[in-house]
Regions:
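N-terminal strand-loop-strand
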Residues: 1-25, 52-56
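Short, charged/polar surface micro-motifs in flexible loops or helix N-caps
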Residues: 4-9, 17-19, 31-32, 77-84
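Short, cationic motifs built from Arg/Lys/His that form the positively charged side of catalytic pockets
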Residues: 13-14, 42-46, 97
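Nudix hydrolase/Nudix homology domain
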Residues: 18-23, 91-137
C-alpha cells in the first residue's frame, strides 16, 4: 500500500529471508473471506501502527525472484488517518519509516523487490484505478 504524506512514503524495515534487513511497502497476505482492500488496510496497521484508508488501485505487478518464486502484488493508494505509536508491530518488522522517493531509490539492493520503487513511480505518474476494478463473487 502506498501511503504518501508531505512527499514522503510510508515503508517498513523488515527482516526477509533470515538475516537480510530490507525495505518494503506495508504488504501481506489475505485472510479468509477478506477483500484485497481490507487486507491492505489491516496489514498496514499491523506492520506500521498507522490506520489508513485506501482509495484507489495503483496497479497489479508480477515479478519472479531470482530464486524462482513468483509474486503477484496488488498495490493500493491510501491516506494515513491515525498513528498508534504504542501498538507493537508484526513479527519481523523493525520499524516504520517515512522516506522521500530519492531516499528510497538510494536503497537499491536493500529494497525487498523492484516492485517497491515501481509502485511509487506509478503512483507519482498518477496511475489510479477504481477499487471497483475487483469483483468479489
Amino acid at each position: 500500500t502506498i501511503i504518501e504524506r508531505d512527499g514522503r512514503f510510508l515503508l517498513v524495515e523488515e527482516y526477509a529471508d533470515g538475516d537480510d534487513l530490507v525495505y518494503n511497502q506495508p504488504a501481506g497476505h489475505l485472510d479468509e473471506q477478506e477483500t484485497l482492500a481490507a487486507a491492505a488496510i489491516r496489514e498496514t496497521l499491523e506492520e506500521t501502527a498507522w490506520e489508513v484508508d485506501v482509495n484507489a488501485i495503483i496497479g497489479v505487478y508480477y515479478w519472479t525472484h531470482p530464486r524462482g518464486e513468483t509474486y503477484v502484488r496488488t498495490c493500493f493508494a491510501g491516506t494515513a488517518l491515525h498513528h498508534h505509536p504504542d501498538q507493537p508491530l508484526d513479527h519481523g518488522i523493525q520499524r516504520a519509516v517515512w522516506l522521500a522517493r530519492e531516499e528510497i531509490a538510494l536503497l537499491g539492493p536493500r529494497l525487498r523487490s523492484p516492485m517497491v520503487l515501481r509502485c511509487i513511480d506509478d503512483y507519482l505518474a498518477g496511475k489510479r484505478y477504481p477499487l471497483e476494478f475487483f469483483s468479489y463473487l
